Amino acid sequence: MVHFEQWEGFEGRIWREEVNVRDFIQKNYKPYAGDERFLAGPTEATDKLWGILQKLQKEERAKGGVLDMETHVVSGLTAYGAGYISEADKALEQIVGLQTDKPLKRAFMPFGGIKMAEEACRNYGYEPDPELHRIFTEYAPTHNEGVFMAYTPEMKKARHNKIITGLPDTYGRGRIVGDYRRVALYGIDFLIEEKTKDLANCGDGTMTEDVIRLREEIAKQIKALKGMKAMAAAYGFDISKPAANAKEACQWLYFGYLAAIKTQNGAAMSVGRISTFLDIYMERDLARGLITEAQAQELIDHMVMKFRMVKFARIPSYNALFSGDPVWATLEVGGIGVDGRSMVTKNDYRFLHTLENMGPSPEPNMTVLYSEDLPDAFKHYAAKISVLTSSVQYENDDVMKPVWGDDYSICCCVSATQTGKEMQFFGARANLAKCLLYALNGGVDVKTREQVGPAYRPVAGEVLDYDEVIAAYDRMMDWLAGLYVNTLNLIQYMHDKYYYEAAEMALIDTDVRRTFATGIAGFSHVVDSLSAIKYAKVTPIRDETGLIVDFKTEGDFPRYGNDDDRADDIAVWLLGKFLEKIKKRHTYRDSEPTTSILTITSNVVYGKATGSMPDGRKAGEPLSPGANPSYGAEKNGLLASLNSTAKLPYHWALDGISNTQTINPGALGHNDEERAKNLVQVMDGYFMQGAHHLNVNVFGTEKLIDAMEHPEKEEYANFTIRVSGYAVKFIDLTREQQLDVIARTCHDRM
């Protein structure tokens, strides 16, 4: 059994014999059932550093969204020396480490695609070093180049026509959460020893392709671990051994995360589930009199400050899909252990308290793992923070725990992954609304007039027949699912080949479980359109070529979002049918297929590429985001809308079901305390039905309109809203996306 002096005072055996952070947590954490009265406000150092950073953020916004960009140095673990928020005030920083050499400066990351890295620079007025272009076009192939060399004509056509879109073929796929806690608990040298053992035992003497690839990957992981040590040494820290105290635990853990964001520009670079783990160190130091509560809070404030600073260089087409500069540094608090004990600690409060000490912020993507069994005081405090900041999302721990255990992280917006045991292949989304139009028009795209899907017989007749439409849709969805999975298989293969996440995978078990994520866009529009065809009279309007370009819908029909089983049953059918078709296909590296109903802000882009629908949505209008009902469809209030979404089975959408709701403050109560109490009651009822996710916004439409018209007002500098799966500063959205948010339902009654 291994023993380090840094482990003095910790209980347990298994975690000492193998890399097992969960066992360490279960044997050592102390649940906290009290309220927030113990919390400390910001220290002088926190206020000063946050003030400096806010000034830099204002300069960044004034320069069009980018403060500075690298043009000569390729990002890597040791590409830069030490960097600080302020060189003059670096002694104030309790947690150190920047992606580059300056705060908010964006790194040059060409391995996902040299063209994209160069375009990101030029879009903001920076000219990349031509030598980098030569190197990455003549000598070092990139992920993007590999993908487009292998794409079939059919894949390219489907991508161009945006029936599958948002694909991670021009940027890092992300959604891989390294178990950054391992750096703090074990130190790098022990982790290297364990990976070296894995390398020695990889293969049984027959060098198959899988064995050869795995041996190469483990070797890359060991190299990355050594690079982490060198990176930390530049800041004067030796992370070869375990962390000895709370400050080192926070710093060591952050160095693990910093290694990930220095080497990958994934769409989601989640932090993971760290609050309870770090609380163990906090409690030990507090008991020994080594720190005060103010110092404990300062450590968390400074760590969160670093998460708020994460930036990547992006191209305009990426920003259109994922608006507002998100990085999904998702961080979880709360949850209940499989033994029934609450996993809420004082540290869970401290992380939420950063939204008070430093104000609202989209990052880290703060996520409460919700259960009706959470301590009442914690539920009330989280709800209060939601009412005050609209910066928190909630996910149902009671439906996720049976699948992922009690040590999972949220690896993107809403997707769970078992920490240190699993990885996810990110797969963007298929536009099922567009697929329905393909079914009606025999595979012809109404926007481009190209034959994209199979040339099946178009749906005929003066009035659409439900059974005929369903049969045609089933065939077209089958084609789309096959093409979608094949395209993703190709992308994931090339990402492993040219842009492997060595730093993150070094902090995950070698024998890793892989999930294969897919996604659905246009969900509610398909449901309502099929409902209209079934329960009303839908007459297709054809142009001179016979192509259906619009619809005349007569009569009432049930809409998803009103707790009406006639519509909601169609929604359940659609989700199950799509997953069934995905699961029939071969998936890369024996990964387990999952799907999601999640669109981010890409619903605007998807909508532009989608024609008119039978539900009344016109061509080019935004699609409704995630699993939300169509705009204007909700007629029976907030609770009815939530009840509809709750009927969607989580086990059919393990990649997540995103639901975003905006509630007028007056609808929740007369004051913040009453609003928090009522919000808890709403969430208890919603999640007890088996619902998966809820974004909560508490403000009125008039505030959004004022922020759009007067972004210069100080009160809107950090005005944060929840959108499909993440949070964003409202003034960082494009006007088109702001108008889309304003158009969404704001509930004035429960």
What are these regions (language model features)?
Residues 2-750:
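Conserved catalytic cores of very large enzyme subunits
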